[in-house]
Amino acid sequence: MASIGRLAITWLGHSTFLLGTPGGRRLIFDPWLVDNPRCPEEWKRKVPTVDLVLVSHGHSDHVGDAARVARENNAPVVGMVELCRWLQRQGVRRVEPMNLGGTITVAGLRVTLVEAQHSSACLDDESPIYLGAPSGFILTLEDGRVI
């Protein structure tokens, strides 16, 4: 991960990315590490240090390790309302529940939830649980860049 002042993106397989911002923040998108066949082994064994967790939807290959990463970092999770409430039941203390089109400032960054076309449910004891609409993220970084 890059030092302060630079933007760095590290792909950890499938849809899991670590983002290091110019201001020194560390974010993880759709943290699926342990069961992710494309995730490097060293990342499966350790929980990355992050300031913010962003989860796009409720499929296990996107939300799989979100609760563990958030709990171990005491990091807030940004996602749809239903998904955040479900993560609270998994022991996540800090959530930023949102709806599509909403914008918040969290960890010094502006986050906007945008529409995505996909399904969004997880299997909990083999019964599907709807976890809100799928979403994407628009981030405004500390230096004003938008990604």
Residue positions per predicted region:
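Pre-active-site segment of Zn-dependent metallo-hydrolases
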Residues: 18-59, 64-71, 82, 120-129
